[in-house]
């Protein structure tokens, strides 16, 4: 028995309860020379090897049959590079000792990570292929400050937590280890003795790729190369740009007909991308593609925030999909979920045995609606983890925008909570000050680091300044979903036309607050689930009236100020609710031409016409870009307004939300002349009744609605028409 290492230390090391393996393992100076110690379970013989010559310098003595070896190299005083020749089951292997390498994380990185100001923590934490002292391998780093011991386990060490315990950097709470020979494509996890003495297996929070569910291991893979933002992609996100978003759940847009299995990222690149381009959309918005264990969460309960889900292929396959979208002229928006995470024990929940990422008090840290945990935004390392993730998707994948989910649940402490179920902030208020600061900081950093990328907030309350700059007291988002507009207009459209006259304000109210935010008008996935019916099925009347009302509504929506968002299936009037376990009802477009084809053609024409005419998008957020011409004709449910571009060019939009055609409907206009009908939702091309104005109509010098000149139009039943003034 050696007197150099205490038996209790050897026992603790072998049992996996020793927190400082580098103080024992590796090469150490002693009075007798350099001593090399190694923990190599199941080994029978171990030699220290001179790499250049292959000469055996010393044989290590087995001090414990469970695999602890030690030996002295006399007359050597200075550390040198060495290898170990290890005999396992009669076979000799030459390995590099992971415990001969010094600290991995640079002092500045460690300081920035501790301060929560490391803009790109994913470049340091996680698993990264590297070469150290001429040796190739992988460096692992994980933040677990309260764990008693952390080891890397994986395919490279038989998932044995004794073989690769990590070094704790006490100043930052980060554990680190370089493992020679570990390479891309291998599975790994972190095995730890947590703060309470329990053994845990955890996926890497910073894993760049993960196993296909239900398996939960992380994959070693390098950081993807940075994607350069082009000027075209930047311009497509600007406030004066036409933005028409096709919102997609990749797992149910279309499936293989023979087995109902998902399309891969590459198949989606070949099918979804050209379809969205043909339909005239400018942006694709993807429901969360971060790795998540439960299909039914639609991705909104992620466990691998840095890993694209393996359901549809590899990380590189996802990059291929995004590249294909960009090549087709489509910007890509990613739904991003920094508001909460699931309770699965392999992921972030009680990561090191403490409430590391979440609040400890369930009144702050538990979301009862979704059975999820809420991030502790006041903890610097947690907010850094999330801010870094936002940058990661934009810089490393070329994501053009992030749509932030459930912002209201983040910024209000009493969100969906009764009295006594929440804790006021330090001033006694209901606002979550830490979450507000986190959102402001995230938007500020994105604006500074990736100018041209934007964020969009799904925020369901009247919290002021969501899309206003931070220096004006806002949250700093570029856009906000207008959920109030969506609810009001859908409530109006589901009414029998007889009763719409009594709810006229539901269509006009939105203009009273339209310029308080930069709005996106969303008809999202949330509106076609949970018994709400499809958008088509909410329309009243028989089939003709349902389709006519839907077309009129789309014509109204595309003309109303604000960017557009339509969930998949709505573009061809899917009749049933969305089912995440099945394909869209593409069979509705099979066979002869029908009403569904008509709606699909209308949406395509709406997109193309909207994009072509600057008046329809250039001044969405400027009052000069909109003016009511007829706002008070509630008895006939008629509304008429103009959209205007910076040069003063106007487009007239007229909607009739009753099934009664309105002939010789006169209203005052600003610009006399000849007006051409450029879109009519009642056109026979869309399977309407084909009522209209024969292409063009001339104004009259007849005063109406306080204006000197006027138009007399036929307003088709349940329809919206757009007219543009012809040049003289």
Swiss-Prot record:
Matching SMART domains: Aamy
Catalytic site: 405 (nucleophile), 458 (proton donor)
Keywords annotated in UniProt: Carbohydrate metabolism, Glycogen biosynthesis, Glycogen metabolism, Glycosyltransferase, Transferase
GO cellular-component term (any): cytosol
Keyword Glycosyltransferase: yes
GO molecular function terms attached to this record: 1,4-alpha-glucan branching enzyme activity; cation binding; hydrolase activity, hydrolyzing O-glycosyl compounds
Any GO BP annotation: glycogen biosynthetic process
E.C. number: 2.4.1.18
InterPro entries named among the record's database cross-references: A-amylase/branching_C, Branching_enzy, GlgB, GlgB_N, GlgB_N_E_set_prok, Glyco_hydro_13_cat_dom, Glyco_hydro_13_N, Glyco_hydro_b
NCBIfam families: branching_enzym (TIGR01515), PRK05402.1 (NF003811), PRK12313.1 (NF008967)
Subunit structure: Monomer.
Official protein name in the record: 1,4-alpha-glucan branching enzyme GlgB
Annotated source species: Shigella flexneri serotype 5b (strain 8401)
UniProt gene name: glgB
